[in-house]
Amino acid sequence: DDTVSFAPGEVYKYFQQLNQIINSAEKNIFIVDPYLDASIFSHYLNSRNPEVTVRLLTGKRSKAVKPAAEKYIEEFGPVVEVKKSNQIHDRVIFIDGYSGWISGQSIKDAAKDKPTYLVAVSPDVIPDKLRAYESIWQSATKFE
């Protein structure tokens, strides 16, 4: 499906769908979400293929990501890189550089008490969207 809608309370349905998207990655995952928290590791990244690398671009207020990332890297190796930027608003998941999904809400709160969606990004739009976020990634700050 190109669009999946979630009613308020359909947290598990969202969880299943996003895990299916993450599981489809063969090389890399690039997640952009200004409000990520530590749950990104336990709820979603554990389902990825162990060889798949992950980049997380989050907002400057997402302090809980740093200790979780450190513990994750300690256990699984340097497969995750986290940066922060105040230049992001969207929530986007890129898979292997050629597929992408937009989340209507932040991943950490998706479908808790409001409706949301996951929409596939059109293949002809992905290169431009990815290029824009790669540029932000380059100027983003590493969590220290």
Role assignments for model-derived ranges:
Residues 1-15, 24, 30-31, 35-144:
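PLD/PLD-like phosphodiesterase catalytic module centered on the HKD motif
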Residues 18-20:
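Exposed extracellular interaction/assembly regions and N-terminal maturation sites
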